[in-house]
Design a protein with these regions (language model features):
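Membrane-interface aromatic/basic loop that binds lipid-linked glycans or pyrophosphate carriers
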Residues: 123, 285-354, 720-790
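Aromatic "clamp/platform" in nucleotide-sugar-dependent glycosyltransferases that forms part
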Residues: 620
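Conserved acidic donor-binding segment of nucleotide-sugar-dependent glycosyltransferases
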Residues: 652-663, 672-677
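A conserved mid-protein helix/loop that constitutes part of the nucleotide-sugar donor-binding site
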Residues: 369-376, 535, 544-559
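A conserved acidic beta->alpha catalytic loop
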Residues: 50-59, 80, 576-578
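Donor-binding/catalytic cores of nucleotide-activated saccharide
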Residues: 105-220, 225-244
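Glycosyltransferase donor-sugar binding loop
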Residues: 390-397, 540, 568-582
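Nucleotide-activated donor-binding/catalytic signature segment of Leloir-type glycosyltransferases, i.e.
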Residues: 582-600
Length: 790
């Protein structure tokens, strides 16, 4: 090789400088530097920066410098690849700059092509094509090439380049597949912070470079650069040590924002920076998801300290949707280790206020038992002197329960992908919420709502309106919330003592607390209800056949009417059109128009309790059934499917229980009460007596204690290191349930796809009415067709 370089026509000594940052890549470095040595051009220099390598890399660099005068070696203490490149750039003398990683290669004629591009393309950044090697996965190989290699185009404005790279992601932010004018890249590095960085340094440098650029030329060439896969920090198998290193990459966002602020950049640049923040955060979530479970608590602890929950919660929800119990256990351990609860709340008030503010969340405020509970809970909180903020996802003024004027209403999105975290958190801070009462314990968003509150250091009280048995019994496509998630709440209010005991075995701070029962509903009812002129049987509930069994209620009504033609039966509740159509068709087919009346949702259900003779309940599972409570308030004898865990039924008074799904038995029990006035009177008085302890319960006092000290550990909460025998048994049951759900989930999804097709097609609705034989035949055809396509 010649000993003297060929000078360019301007002030630069060389046509092109190649910067090679080296750190502990001895296994690949010789091959890398050899690819430079084979370049035929002499008007180039190779600046190799040894960034404090502890292997043989340093010696290999020196050997090549002795062999080829184009190599210039700089040895420095370890500063990270960002500053290693910066050192190389600032020591370069070329008109153009190219980058080569120490484990990658240049094509034999790469520099010839690069210099030709520099001479013939009027741009300050020129992109060329690359290839990937050491990759056994064709899809991965093709994906990288699709991301890096792009069709020829010219981007003439720097903000266009920025949007293309960081928002549209139509071009990569990698440094090594481009050459840069030396003046541009040196100016860029002059504004880059001297920070130790081994990840995302390309994004940082490229962002600053395009800010100062005026044109990027993308050229389709033969591969000039060969990218070695599965050796660098960004492609290595994730470990907790690597994950910790990766955490430093998010710091570039702060540096970029500072850079943009100083230069009073336009909003579009800040938007691009935010998009980059989201991308880096999402990458970190995916990396964390690949860690062994034993490392997840430590990773989460670091992650929570580093990243913004508003940015990462949507991706966290997406990535861990099928591993929520794993994430919950790891998060609980992480929070426990960090002891975040000892610090002050994250959102400080501008001025102290005497009133405590309580937030209440449920997805809606109409049409349901939980909503009715909340409508009765709000006056209790107001009477205690608290301010109340009601959070819901839906709003329907014409159907909602009355809301006191002093209650603040906030609507939040029903998805983290739609900005739920930001809107929720902003409102919690704006209204100085001191504690959040969350009523949606079976929501697929519960875990992430609890994480958001824990990270904001906001105490949460979770009310569990369902039972675990209910969740596990209604089908594989129904949300099942493992008790481990409840550990993230400060207090869990369960509606039965048996559920309370179960949660406590998981270390959940659970306590039994009955639902509020409206005073207005019972204050004027001092005697058993009269049967009236016509015996009446009442069924109240949502038309959700999965565990309310309204279809079985209709069959029970039919059998009762066969024996008592004078009986009037009411089925009161809301449901989708198909459920309502089913009821109407059932009544019509069996010619029961004079005996069965369907009443859609109404907030004035008391009038039906007042006129009823017997109350019927056909649920497979309930927790604290407001329907039972209201029936007992009205002194109605109850016939119910057996649910021995219910607090409202434990005393055995005021009701007759039959086996689950025993239609004959339920009909016989109702007829027995209708035909025996003495039995009716006894059960009626028992019902009134049975509800009395719940009416006298000091619910306001219990809630005041919870809201003032939500973190107070309740008696009975298991705090041992080793799991209790009860927990081990339940863990086994839950694991077997999940295994079974995985095995059947595809069949449930198939049914759901078919159901949606039949439901949403206008043509199908028109020519195939619900309940028709033709409709059932087409359903079978669609199902078979779907399986064939699968």
């Amino acid at each position: 090789m010649p000993s003297m370089p060929i000078h360019s026509e301007d002030q630069y000594t060389y046509k092109l400088s190649v910067i090679v940052a080296v750190y502990n890549v001895a296994a690949y470095l010789d091959e890398c530097l050899s690819s430079l040595h084979r370049q035929k051009r002499t008007d180039v220099e190779f600046i190799v920066v040894d960034d404090g390598s502890t292997d043989a890399s340093s010696a290999i660099c020196d050997q090549w410098a002795a062999r080829d005068c184009r190599f210039k070696i700089i040895h420095q203490e370890n500063k990270g690849s960002l500053l290693a490149r910066k050192t190389g750039v600032m020591h370069s003398s070329g008109q153009w700059i190219a980058f080569l990683d120490g484990d990658d290669l240049f094509a034999d004629d790469a520099l010839e092509h690069m210099c030709s591009l520099a001479d013939n393309c009027d741009a300050d950044i020129i992109q060329f094509s690359i290839d990937v090697f050491n990759c056994n996965n064709k899809d991965q190989h093709d994906n990288i090439l699709e991301y890096v290699n792009k069709p020829e185009k010219i981007l003439k404005k720097n903000d266009t380049i920025c949007a293309s790279s960081f928002q549209k992601k139509s071009i990569s932010w990698t440094l090594w597949n481009r050459i840069y004018k030396s003046s541009l890249i040196k100016k860029s590095y002059a504004h880059i912070k001297d920070v130790h960085l081994v990840c995302a340094e390309d994004a940082y440098t490229f962002f600053i470079a395009i800010f100062f650029s005026s044109k990027l030329f993308i050229k389709k060439t033969t591969p000039l650069y060969f990218y070695r896969l599965n050796t660098g920090v960004s492609t290595s198998r994730e470990t907790i040590d690597l994950f910790t290193k990766h955490l430093s990459e998010i710091t570039i966002i702060e540096h970029i924002r500072e850079f943009l602020t100083i230069r009073a950049a336009e909003k579009s640049w800040f938007d691009a920076c935010t998009a980059l923040q989201t991308t880096l955060t999402n990458i970190a979530v995916y990396r964390m998801a690949t860690l062994p479970e034993k490392d997840l608590p430590a990773a989460l602890s670091l992650f929570f300290d580093t990243y913004d929950p508003v940015v990462y919660l949507p991706t966290l929800q997406n990535v861990f949707s099928g591993r929520q119990d794993t994430l919950a256990c790891a998060a609980h351990t992480a929070f426990k280790q960090k002891d975040v609860r000892d610090s002050q709340t994250a959102h400080q008030r501008a001025t102290p206020t005497e009133k405590k503010t309580v937030g209440i969340f449920y997805h809606r405020y109409f049409n349901g038992g939980v909503e009715r509970v909340i409508s009765q809970q709000i006056p209790i909180f107001l009477k205690l002197g608290y301010r109340v903020v009601l959070f819901t996802e839906q709003v329907c003024p014409e159907k909602e329960y009355p809301l006191p004027s002093e209650v603040i209403r906030v609507i939040v999105p029903d998805s983290y992908a739609q900005g739920r975290a930001s809107i929720f958190l902003t409102a919690l801070r704006e209204y100085d919420v001191d504690v959040l009462c969350h009523h949606s314990a079976s929501s697929h968003l519960l875990l992430f709502d609890l994480l958001l509150c824990r990270l904001a250091k906001l105490p949460t009280v979770l009310t569990r309106h369902e039972t675990l048995a209910q969740d596990m019994s209604v089908g594989a496509d129904y949300p099942f919330t493992p008790p481990t998630i409840f550990q993230l709440a400060d207090t869990v209010c369960a509606l039965s003592s048996s559920e309370t005991y179960l949660y406590q075995q998981y270390g959940v701070n659970a306590r039994y607390l009955p639902n509020p029962i409206s005073v207005s509903a019972h204050e004027d009812i001092d005697a058993p209800s009269a049967t009236g002129n016509r015996p009446t049987v009442l069924w109240v509930g949502r038309l959700f056949d999965l565990h309310k069994n309204y279809k079985e209620a209709l069959e029970i009504f039919k059998k009762i009417i066969e024996h008592r033609k004078d009986v009037l039966c009411y089925i009161v509740g809301s449901g989708e059109s198909r459920e309502q159509n089913y009821i109407q068709n059932f009544i019509k087919i069996h010619k029961l128009q004079n005996n069965i009346v369907y009443v859609p949702y109404t907030p004035h259900v008391d009038r039906y309790y007042n006129s009823a003779t017997v109350h019927l309940l056909t649920s497979s599972s309930e927790s604290f059934s407001m329907v039972i409570a209201e029936g007992k308030i009205h002194a109605l004898p109850l016939v119910t499917y057996d649910m021995p865990w219910l607090e409202l039924l434990k005393d055995g008074k005021g009701h007759i229980s039959v086996r689950q799904h025993d239609i004959e038995g339920a009909a016989d029990a109702v007829l027995m009460i209708l035909n025996d006035s003495i039995l009716h009177q006894r059960l009626s008085y028992e019902a009134r007596e049975s509800i009395q302890p719940f009416l006298e319960y000091d619910l306001a006092g219990a809630w005041k204690e919870i809201l003032e000290t939500p973190q107070k550990i309740q008696p009975g909460v298991y705090q041992g290191e080793a799991p209790s025998n009860m927990r081990l048994l339940c863990d086994h049951i839950f694991s077997m349930y999940r295994e079974g759900r995985r095995n059947t989930s595809s069949s449930f999804r198939t049914k759901e796809y078919i159901k949606q097709f039949m439901k949403n097609s206008p043509l199908i609705k028109r020519i195939l009415p619900i309940g028709s034989r033709r409709r059932e035949f087409v359903k079978k055809v669609v199902k078979n067709l779907y399986h064939r396509i699968r």
